[in-house]
Amino acid sequence: MTQMRFTKEDFDTFTIEGLDPRMEVLKEQVRPKLTLLGEHFAPTLSALTGDEMFPHVAKHARRSVNPPADSWVAFANSKRGYKKLPHFQIGLWDTHMFVWFAIIYESPIKEEYGRLLEAKQEDITKQIPGHFVWSPDHTKPGAYKQSDMDQEQLKTLFERLQTVKKAELLCGIQLQKEDVINMNNNEFLQTIEDAFRKLSFLYTLTQKVS
């Protein structure tokens, strides 16, 4: 099987100084792996969600000065794009990798979906494992572990999605670089698939409002 696990060199790409040098290595080393992950997991996500899912590898085309701090492949039920749609992501920063379900700032269903999340909060905390994390901003590496949050903190994230124009909501797993490097390829792929199986619950909720 083709090796798709992220390596130390993949993570180190995001420590290279300068836009052009970093983008060169990103295109040569990381992007082919993201493409393979996209091809590998699109059928899995299609089966889990009931929607045909298409992979979109981040291009970072609009950057002219600052190099990207992370990169990813996203999956959505459209060939044309993903940012306005509920979607999944696999990606990495220099310190960790992530597997996300995401509703980001361009989504038109945020308010309605936020209300549904609030109504389904008890179900969500049962379906989503405690070690999964939540984030209100895809551009920042930090996140909150669900087991460390009380119900009020989680509710605040759902309310924010309804009321703040630029609000986002992401849920998933973060794996530290050292843990990923020590996995074999099968463990890596299985970890991602297991996360997607749990996160598909959040996607199916979007099908009630989109």
Swiss-Prot record:
Organism of provenance: Bacillus velezensis (strain DSM 23117 / BGSC 10A6 / LMG 26770 / FZB42) (Bacillus amyloliquefaciens subsp. plantarum)
A Pfam family per the record: DUF1054
Name this polypeptide is given: UPF0637 protein RBAM_014510
Endpoints of the signal sequence: none
InterPro entries xrefs: UPF0637, UPF0637_domain_sf
Annotated disulfide bonds: none
Recorded family membership: Belongs to the UPF0637 family.
